[in-house]
Curated annotation (Swiss-Prot):
GO terms for cellular component: cytoplasm. The gene is fadJ. Its EC number is 4.2.1.17, 5.1.2.3, 1.1.1.35. This is Fatty acid oxidation complex subunit alpha. It comes from Photorhabdus laumondii subsp. laumondii (strain DSM 15139 / CIP 105565 / TT01). InterPro entries: 3-OHacyl-CoA_DH_CS (IPR006180), 3-OHacyl-CoA_DH_NAD-bd (IPR006176), 3HC_DH_C (IPR006108), 6-PGluconate_DH-like_C_sf (IPR008927), ClpP/crotonase-like_dom_sf (IPR029045), Enoyl-CoA_hydra/iso (IPR001753), FA_oxidation_alpha_subunit (IPR050136), FadJ (IPR012802). NCBIfam families: FadJ, PRK11154.1. PROSITE patterns: 3HCDH.
Amino acid sequence: MTQAQHDAAPITTGTNQTASVFSFDVRPDKIGIITINVPGEKVNTLKAEFVDQFLNVFKQAQQSSGLKGLILISGKPDTFIAGADISMIAGCKTKEDARDLAEKGQKLFSQIANYPLPVVAAIHGACLGGGLELALACHWRVCSQDDKTRLGLPEVQLGLLPGSGGTQRLPRLIGVSSALDIMLTGKQLRAKQALRLGLVDDAVPLDILLDIAIEKVKKGIPVRKPLPWQQRLLVGPVGRYFLFNIVRKKTLAKTRGHYPAPERIIEVVKEGLEKGMSQGLRAEAVAFGELAMTRESAALRNLFFAATSLKNETGSSEKPAKIKHVGILGGGLMGGGIANVTATRGKLPVRIKDINEKGISQVLKYTWDLLSKRVKQKRLRPAERAQQMMLISGTTDYRGFAQTDIVVEAVFEDLSLKQKMVAEIETNAKPETIFASNTSSLPIHQIAEKAQRPEQVIGLHYFSPVDKMPLVEVIPHQGTSEKTIATAVSLAKKQGKTAIVVGDKAGFYVNRILVPYISEAAHCLVAGEPIDHIDGALVNFGFPVGPINLLDEVGIDVGTKIMPVLVEQLGPRFAAPESLDAVLKDGRKGRKNGRGFYLYAPGPRKFWQFGKRDKKVDSSVYTLLNITPESHMLSSEIAQRCVMLMLNEAVRCLDEGIIRSPRDGDIGAVFGIGFPPFFGGPFRYIDSLGCARVVEILRRLESQYGDRFVPCECLVNMAEQNKSFYP
């Protein structure tokens, strides 16, 4: 609801505080409108200092004679309330400070919930975190059907729980099972999903949102129907016992005990159901205070701030060029993924060139299948699917490329082929067109070597699967112009990606820190450690999958192709054990051909196989490598060997200027390879251990396993000077 839409209704202005976040007006029909508009900000966020302002507005409402009810709307174009201002937590020195913060919000929202007249939240745009908790305190909730409208409680993603009554009001409104699902995942709901769950009372076109809110006020405070019997059953002692046991086990299986917030959410919801709302709110505030002081929450909040700051940067000193049309070379898996995110997220027309029609058809089918899945999930309308599909077209020649502003190349990793692509684009596209290569290993300066306009050649390294992986590495070579850098970053943002600008050197950043990690896992394997023990060690450490499993997923042929390049250009520390060649020679490529270090069941799992793994360790690999699998090392030792090499290489990358800052290195590792977010990234993790401790561990490992563990000079110097990467 915009201010313009608010003003469209006949309004009698009451006391109006223009400098305030909240303004109060009364309509001729005696319905009060409270508009939320944080001055000078793009979106509304809640801060502790706003409480007094809101109470003043509430006081005005109470003094307004004949008032029939209140409607809360936003003065921002596409945001209701994006949540509480997370930076407030940084000002809390103790758990008591953070608890007080939660209690302030609870008391304010309790006043809304207990207001004797109907209060309606008219929601358009993001309604998240504290914004949804505010809406939950209202008697009615109506929202727009607009795609920008999203509702959720994402606090768990910051290592927190909803601290202003959300853990207590949501289960009572929609049932404990659905409420736990929303809070434990941090998922965001669209309007129709929210309506189906009972989170909102109506989802309507934006044009009539205020009208429907007015209707709700006129109906008075609603008498809520009891929840369905299935949900009521779960609130009883027996239902609670089984539900919370199941949820706790599933949650622990996912978090492996690394994240305290999900467990506290479960505890607090359970306490509120067993002991009542008041006790539940007290438990919520205490838990919020304690979680705010945890290392895990600090790490997750730091990542949030890092990612947010990157979104506001162009990566360059210049402004980007406008992007109206995008070209893609190659209709394979990567080309198809890049085309998909460009059209569906960037809403940009995409022209794909492939050597045959089959490649183009594969891209169209790939995007159709992904969009159809969203249609089936009710997250997209069939008409929207059709509109997005119309943005993608294909050709086997260069027709349509004359109007492209940027062309992303996703062909085979062959230098001469990529150089040929540069020449053909320079011939068939306009002079201003940027050429971006999705290479994972070839230096960009070599790809640009024969270009007529090398300043318009850059690397854009996407990660597979493109529709899921959030990171893009932007790789300028020495001659790349600032405008080209800014434009490449701009495209990545339009595609919904987080972009980091990295140096043009073998492996760039992500692959360079990943290869030693995987190679060390291979060293453990050829020494006799079982595959599942190695992978389990790193999953227990906090990675989403183990290194051997990851190699299978990426493709053993693809994953090992970059290793010789790194060995040649950066040294023997990147070398994998020679015996690993036997795996490749045996035709094992990983999941894509059903044979790797694991064996994969063909086809999708049947319904009776739900929960069963679709893969198992292929024991014939041990025969191939001439080893007898037997565990001699603790899981923690295996994890330490693999992770320490990654940390050491990350510091080298910073020292050499491959990454611009520790922040970029942390984002790259977490978003690119799944470095455990609760550590905050490699550099935050080093700071938590201390440089001296990391050097000590590396030297011990060097004495046991060789020169690949020699600590880099930068790390040694920082240890000697007792320095850290962050203030």
